[in-house]
């Protein structure tokens, strides 16, 4: 065999080896991307955002046009399907004004308006948002404000009314009841900010573990957002009833509405 033939074969061998090496590197890179860099199905799902439908946007625009015309401090609307809790929500710079000030601006003790804590973001984006309202039943025979929140201290009522809906000018938020606790008026649980995820989970964990009325097998997670409906107990003005609710994540809203849509629809009960 000539030197030329040997050289030619050697060149072909080198070319083939180079092609194989490139293929191996490319294939390895693909597997690394799939294993470590490419977003998983769960991650993509968790990052999904909720977009209000045109129908929902029109409904909210019409509703809040009237609400904001009556009270420019309106930030939302809260109702609990199957109950008579059906109230606009306001926010101002303090937590005292709306204890007596009605939604239309008239002062009426024991009525007032449901209001968001002054330290919360009005778009319900905080990890823990507080709404406050009177329970009027012992003083006035009606279901206005947060009277119906007190009924959640009975497990059967809690189980029968698991969802709360918050409407804002931009969209709806859906919540599921997690726990109902009765606490002193000056409880340390009244917080709107936390040091870190661990601090948040610790407080929510204590609340869930000590609650006598709750949804079973709930795992508190710092990834979730919570809403609290807080009101006084009719039998004792020094204690409070706090209903804790978990916000349905945007990644779950579409399926949640498909499953529960009819029972979540707004049905007015205000006189």
Task: Give names to the regions the model predicted.
Residues 28-271:
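Solvent-exposed, non-transmembrane regions of membrane-associated and secreted proteins
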Residues 1-12:
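N-terminal Lys/Arg-rich, disordered targeting/topogenic segments
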Residues 16-31:
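Hydrophobic membrane-insertion alpha-helices, especially the h-region
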